[in-house]
């Protein structure tokens, strides 16, 4: 009984394999293997499962299954060949060569085996040549580096060549085995920057993807020495050592699983102790006065990247708990540094922001309330421990720490603002005579006033002080920060017209001053950055954004600042935020009228929309931004380095692009200025929301533009994946619809694009929307399928048995919607022209096929009628029996009536096709001419 079931499962697996469902086929073969002990059947099942492994690129599994089949029958030629293919992909060329040699012995005339032999022979020779040349290159470089008398430039060149070798598997292994680590340590001892740098980069290459080597190198060089090298002032050196540490961490934690690097031959013990030691040393670096600002930044970067979980589905957050317990106070110390104080640690412009990001990531990585409470208590103890009426510097550090936390986990920062004396201390410091105190206090107030309740406290207790500082201070740094503080307080009500914080016209005055500073080219970039930040807050007010987009010099000054500021993340974020506000592309909660009435009845505040936030005003602002050259600025911003262009900024840029693309008439301008190309990276990387918004903007452009112009060259293939992702049923209907329009346009360009769409597995989604009740979605999906059926692999899906694809297309030809009919008839015409089998299949899928065909051939719309007549011709040409059936029906009468019409310019194609159908009937002898 079990044997019979095993045979049935084998047959089922074969059917799945023919339908290219390799996963299901593998499952069927695996189940059959458990049920049988028949050696011949076992060999066949293993051999077939190996074929599935090759198709799914599971080469290790494929080689294993083929080996089991060969164990049963050593002359199983198919199993030998499949194992050979798998071994070739795994890089085991010598073993693959032996298998194909055996195949060629068993079947000497098989050309495939002979070709494989030749190819493998060439590959093996090439591999040997590289191997021997690598050996000699390593040896030569060692000789130059060891020779004290060799010229300096030769030694430097040899060291640089070592870097290249260290990145290759063969070279790295050769260096390692030729006592290379000891030699590289000698290079580190030379204290010559260029040689030390080369040694660090070589070690970095050797550690990548190889756990055993990474462990040996970590213990040989020692973590304290690596950290001391990273602590130097030289930015290039610090970055190189950071990369070395990252390579070691990746290898020890198993993050770096690159197949070609992972051929390890040593047993490695548990790496947790080493990883913990690295983390501990990085935390110590944060508070050491010996560490440069660059070194501190790199330590923070490493902690940011490696401590918090990358996937929150993983439950183990022990690394974060360890850092919170052993290093949170050290991170808080960095956040609380005040650059103007003599006790300040060496910092760069980014150090405090990186520390804030780390605090934010650690806080987000906590799993439960007790962990968050513990985190909060450490922060509270640290801040309250700093308050000292006798020591103003310590108070400054405390307020600066709160300011830094507010830039990280805002909820936590807001709780800390509630601590006794914190807000009062901020306001008190504003009144200090010392400029440093004012600077720290004003910045802290800026960050504190994000929440409306805090902003109200500051408006009540601190606005007069801020205005006083603004009027009296001579220090530009303080003046502009005070202005931003006032801007932020003025925008605390957000877009709610009913919650304006200042008197009518006050925010416009603040904005005018910001625009004035922005246009003043004599002011340094850093100060003008604060002007943009002020506008980022104030443009929540519709009066301000309307004035701003009319001020073309200010707009262009901001765009130039954005183009020049691609190395400053704050500028990019502020510009992006300002543009989001101007285009109203932020999320707006849907207002439910019943809830509004309820809120009014219960005397709750109801948000009011500003009159200038209506659609007409937004459209006018978009037109002005496009005219001022916003697209070229956005295109420059997108090119910024990934460390500067954060995922949040990318999301903001994607929102702006989507708002700009809303009107189809503007899309040509956007494409002409490079908007299409700029959108692609935004759709591929960033937050989920950002990627969806960018993909939607891409879909809008792809739907109406010539893809060759919008996405020139190979870029067009990168557009496909974001559009396919938009077909997800979780996305809203408009996104689905415009993605289908974009894919329709792309699939009409070339077969290579159709193949790309097919490979991205868009077909099931397109078919799904062809079933949709929504008329426009169904029409768009059918039009897309009409283009896709030109691709050979799509046609094969229609040819396969056991599905209703063809039936659906035939039934859609009978729909009342002319556009759906037109698209479905086009698809059916191309399918029946491509395969005679589909002509016969069409008559079997539904009993209504003839009635539907007759309706198409009599359709009022000439394009639909023409497609119907082409289908009729394809059926007549496919098979004599089928042609006879058609002639015996009313279709002959329809063809005769259409064929007898006088062909004018519009009807020429229709009449000509009908006449070709009649000629085909005459060729069969079914009808004869009248005379």
From Swiss-Prot:
One of its GO terms (cellular component) is Z disc. GO terms for molecular function: Hsp90 protein binding. InterPro entries: ARM-like (IPR011989), ARM-type_fold (IPR016024), Armadillo (IPR000225), TPR-like_helical_dom_sf (IPR011990), TPR_rpt (IPR019734), UCS_central_dom (IPR024660). TPR repeats lie at residues 6-39, 43-76, 77-110. Pfam families: UNC45-central (PF11701). GO terms for biological process: cell differentiation; chaperone-mediated protein folding; lens development in camera-type eye; muscle organ development. Changing residue 754 to Q: In MFM11; mislocated away from the A-band to the Z-disk. ARM repeats lie at residues 169-208, 211-250, 751-790. Expressed in eye lens tissues. Expressed in muscle (at protein level). Gene3D superfamilies: Leucine-rich Repeat Variant, Tetratricopeptide repeat domain. Signal peptide: none annotated. It is found in: Cytoplasm, Myofibril, Sarcomere, Z line; Cytoplasm, Myofibril, Sarcomere, A band; Cytoplasm, Perinuclear region; Cytoplasm, Cytosol. Keywords: Cataract, Chaperone, Cytoplasm, Developmental protein, Differentiation, Disease variant, Myofibrillar myopathy, Myogenesis, Repeat, TPR repeat. Acts as a co-chaperone for HSP90 and is required for proper folding of the myosin motor domain. Plays a role in sarcomere formation during muscle cell development. Is necessary for normal early lens development. Interacts with HSP90 in an ATP-independent manner. Interacts with UBE4B; the interaction may target UNC45B for proteasomal degradation. It is linked to Cataract 43: An opacification of the crystalline lens of the eye that frequently results in visual impairment or blindness. Opacities vary in morphology, are often confined to a portion of the lens, and may be static or progressive. In general, the more posteriorly located and dense an opacity, the greater the impact on visual function. Myopathy, myofibrillar, 11: A form of myofibrillar myopathy, a group of chronic neuromuscular disorders characterized at ultrastructural level by disintegration of the sarcomeric Z disk and myofibrils, and replacement of the normal myofibrillar markings by small dense granules, or larger hyaline masses, or amorphous material. MFM11 is an autosomal recessive form characterized by onset of slowly progressive proximal muscle weakness in the first decade of life. More variable features may include decreased respiratory forced vital capacity, variable cardiac features, and calf hypertrophy. This is Protein unc-45 homolog B. It comes from Homo sapiens (Human).
